[in-house]
Amino acid sequence: MSRPQARPIPALRWWIGGVLFASTAINYIDRQTLSILAPYLKQDYHWTNADYADIAIAFRVAYSLGQTVWGRLIDRVGTRRGLTIGVTWYSIVSVLTSLANGFTSFAAFRFLLGAGESANWPGASKAVSEWFPKREREIGRAHV
C-alpha cells in the first residue's frame, strides 16, 4: 500500500525565511534589552559601570566562541535539529535569567544566553543555503 503524497507548501522557503527572520529579530531585540535596562539594573543591583561592562562582555565572549561550536554542531546534527536546540536553549536561559540575584548569577545567565543565541547566525545561514535557490539566496540572507 502506498502512502499518500504530501502536498507541497507553496513558497515554503519564504515561510522558513520568515521564521528565521523572527528568530534573528528576537536575538537582536534581546541583545538590546540589557542596554535599555542598564540604569535600572545598575541601581537595583548596585553595579558599577565596570560590573555592567563585565556582564555585557560575558555575553559577547560566549556569542563569539559559540558560533564556531554551533556551526560544527549544526553541520553534524542538521539545521532543523541544531536550530531547535539553540532556540530552546536561549528561550530557557531567558526565563532563567529572571532568577538572577546578583552580579555572578546575572553574568552567568548572560554568558549562557550568548552561547545559545550564537546558534542563530550559522544555523540561519545554512538554512538559507539549503532552502533557497542560488538566484534567491542573497535576498533570503538579507531577510535573516
Regions found by a protein language model. Give the residues of each.
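Juxtamembrane helix-start elements in MFS-like secondary transporters
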Residues: 48-56
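Extracytoplasmic
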Residues: 15-49
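Helical-face signature of the major facilitator-like transporter fold
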Residues: 20-28, 60, 94, 102-106, ...
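Small-residue-rich segments within alpha-helical transmembrane domains of MFS-like 12-TM solute carriers
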Residues: 28, 32, 98, 114-122
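Helix-breaking motifs and short loop linkers at transmembrane-helix boundaries and internal kinks
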Residues: 46, 78, 99-105, 116, ...
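Residue-level signature of mid-helix packing/kink "hotspots" within the transmembrane helices
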Residues: 32, 60-68, 118
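Conserved MFS/SLC helix-loop-helix module at the cytosolic interface between two early adjacent transmembrane helices
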Residues: 65-104
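Cytoplasmic helix-loop-helix junction between adjacent transmembrane helices
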Residues: 109-141
